[in-house]
C-alpha cells in the first residue's frame, strides 16, 4: 500500500522466513537499502519512522542484568568503529540510576551478577593500565581471568564479588595463535562479505602474526569494548576467561588482516564484528577453534544449585 518510488524495491527484497518474521534479502552481504556512503536509504528518504525496530535500534544494544540495564554501540556500525579508533584515551563507562520498575532479583541472581561484574570490572581496569603495552595488559587481564575462573569453578561467589582473587602473576605475553589457527577459528560457512573467505586464506598463509598496525590506545579501546559487551555472558556459560581470549584473538586477526588487505583499521573492525555478530554460532565456533572448552551451557547454569 506504500505509494512511493521505493515501494517497488521494498516489495522486491522483502522476505518472510519459516517463523513468519520478515527480513530483507541481502546483496553481497549488504542490506539492499544501505547506500555507498553507509547511510540507510529508507531513513534518508522516508525518515526514522519508516525503520523496523532492528534498524531503528542499531547500532545500540541493550541487555537487562539483574537490577540494571547495560547499553553500548555495536562496532558493526562504521561510525561507532571510527569513533572508537579516534579516541585518545581508554574507554570510560558511565552509570546512571534508573526508575524503579518493581523487579526484585533473587539472592542467587544478585550474588552471581555481583561476582561476574566484579571480575569484568577488574579485567577492564587491567586492560587500561598505564605504563604497559597493550599486549602486557592483555596478558595481565588473562592471568586474572583464569584465577577468577578457578574461584568461580569452586563456587566461591562471595569471594569473587568482594574482589578476593589470588594475586595476578607477573606479566607474561600470552601464547599467540598462529595465523592459520585464527583464520580457521573465524571462518564462517555463510560469510556476509563475499571476500571474507579469501582474506582468511591470505591470513592463513602468513608465517606469523605481524605487529599490530593499531596504536596501543586503539587496541585497548577495542579490547575494552569486546569485554564490556561479552563479559557478562558468564552469567549463562560460567566462563569469565573467554571474553578476554576473544578480545586477544580479534586483535591478532586484525593485525593479520591489515597485512593482507587494503582496508583501513576501522573498516576491518566493522568487517570482523559483522561476521561474528550476525552469526549466532560464530562465538561457539571461535571457542572451538581456539580450543577452549565451554564451562557450562545455559541449561546447566540454571540447574546449578551450588550458588
What function would you assign to each model-found segment?
Residues 38, 45-137:
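Internal, well-ordered alpha/beta segment that forms a basic, Gly-enriched binding/recognition surface
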Residues 4, 25, 34, 49, ...:
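Generic alpha-helical scaffold signal
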Amino acid at each position: 500500500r506504500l505509494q512511493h518510488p521505493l515501494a517497488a524495491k521494498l516489495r522486491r527484497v522483502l522476505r518472510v522466513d519459516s517463523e513468519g518474521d520478515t527480513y530483507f534479502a541481502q546483496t553481497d552481504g549488504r542490506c539492499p537499502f544501505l547506500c555507498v556512503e553507509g547511510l540507510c536509504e529508507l531513513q534518508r528518504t522516508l525518515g526514522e519512522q519508516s525503520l523496523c525496530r532492528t534498524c531503528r535500534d542499531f547500532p545500540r544494544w541493550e541487555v537487562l542484568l539483574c537490577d540494571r540495564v547495560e547499553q553500548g554501540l555495536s562496532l558493526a556500525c562504521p561510525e561507532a568503529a571510527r569513533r572508537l579508533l579516534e579516541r585518545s584515551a581508554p574507554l570510560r563507562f558511565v552509570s546512571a540510576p534508573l526508575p524503579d520498575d518493581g523487579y526484585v532479583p533473587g539472592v542467587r541472581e544478585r550474588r552471581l551478577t555481583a561476582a561476574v561484574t566484579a571480575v569484568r570490572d577488574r579485567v577492564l581496569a587491567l586492560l587500561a593500565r598505564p605504563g604497559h603495552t597493550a599486549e602486557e595488559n592483555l596478558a595481565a587481564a588473562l592471568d586474572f581471568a583464569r584465577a577468577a575462573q578457578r574461584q568461580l569453578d569452586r563456587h566461591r561467589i562471595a569471594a569473587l564479588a568482594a574482589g578476593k582473587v589470588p594475586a595476578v602473576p607477573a606479566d607474561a605475553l600470552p601464547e599467540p595463535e598462529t595465523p592459520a589457527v585464527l583464520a580457521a577459528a573465524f571462518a564462517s560457512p555463510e560469510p556476509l562479505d563475499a571476500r571474507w573467505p579469501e582474506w582468511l586464506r591470505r591470513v592463513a598463509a602468513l608465517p606469523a602474526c605481524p605487529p599490530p598496525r593499531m596504536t596501543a590506545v586503539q587496541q585497548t579501546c577495542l579490547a575494552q569494548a569486546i569485554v564490556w559487551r561479552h563479559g557478562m555472558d558468564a552469567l549463562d556459560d560460567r566462563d569469565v576467561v573467554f571474553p578476554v581470549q576473544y578480545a586477544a584473538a580479534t586483535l591478532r586477526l586484525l593485525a593479520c588482516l591489515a597485512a593482507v588487505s587494503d582496508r583501513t583499521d576501522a573498516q576491518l573492525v566493522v568487517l570482523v564484528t559483522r561476521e561474528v555478530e550476525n552469526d549466532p554460532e560464530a562465538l561457539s565456533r571461535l571457542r572451538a577453534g581456539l580450543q577452549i572448552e565451554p564451562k557450562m551451557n545455559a541449561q546447566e547454569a540454571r540447574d546449578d544449585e551450588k550458588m
